[in-house]
Curated annotation (Swiss-Prot):
Similarity field: Belongs to the NadD family.
Class of enzymatic activity (EC top level): transferase
Protein name in UniProt: Probable nicotinate-nucleotide adenylyltransferase
Pathway: Cofactor biosynthesis; NAD(+) biosynthesis; deamido-NAD(+) from nicotinate D-ribonucleotide: step 1/1
Biological process annotations from GO: NAD biosynthetic process
InterPro entries: Cyt_trans-like, NadD/NMNAT, Rossmann-like_a/b/a_fold
Length: 187
């Protein structure tokens, strides 16, 4: 089984997140996508963070594809770093092939994540295009550090067969929606 792991605060989740999930399912040939709602992000302020329960419920309302499973298994870990969470997921599911999925906007700061190199060396990564990120991702620390591991977008459907480090940048429809902008509009 091939599973995409799509993690984030989703504060709030929106149609742009659903679009990323849809693109990942289609282009990566996933059997499932686990939408991992995190209790908190160590790189972001918690002051405007909606409750985990509210964010999970909002994600579940947004999701219509039965292959997408909204999960909050990080809840038992508290605020966890992605590398630790992914290691636990992999250990509990040794026969599943995982792909880490993220929006291109996160690629610019990926090098600030704890154990980011370990993530890239353990999981194939699919980076989904976002407005304003298409060109800047090429100069990101991660893109440069793992430039030799980048596969052609036409091969995205076989990313799961690649041994990490391996990553792909996927172009496609982009949503201008932003959780930050949505929160700011509701102030």
């Amino acid at each position: 089984m091939v599973v995409g792991l799509f993690g984030g605060s989703f504060n709030p989740p929106h149609a742009g997140h659903a679009l990323v999930a849809e693109i990942a399912l289609r282009r990566l040939g996933l059997d499932q996508l686990w939408w991992m709602v995190t209790p908190g992000n160590p790189l972001k302020s918690r002051s405007e963070l909606a409750s985990l329960e509210d964010r999970i419920a909002a994600c579940e309302r947004l999701v219509s594809d039965p292959r997408i499973k909204v999960t909050a298994f990080e809840k038992s870990l508290g605020i966890s770093y992605t590398a630790n969470t992914l290691a636990k997921v992999k250990a509990k599911n040794p026969h599943v092939r995982f792909i880490w999925i993220m929006g291109a906007d996160n690629l610019k700061s990926f090098h600030r994540w704890q154990k980011w190199r370990e993530i890239a060396e353990t999981f194939p990564i699919a980076v989904i295009d976002r407005p304003g990120s298409t060109l800047s991702y090429l100069s990101s620390t991660m893109a440069q550090a793992f430039s030799q591991a980048r596969i052609d977008e036409d091969d995205a459907g076989v990313l799961w067969k690649k041994k990490a480090p391996a990553w792909v940048f996927i172009h496609g429809p982009r949503s201008t929606l932003s959780s930050t902008a949505l929160r700011n509009n509701h102030k």
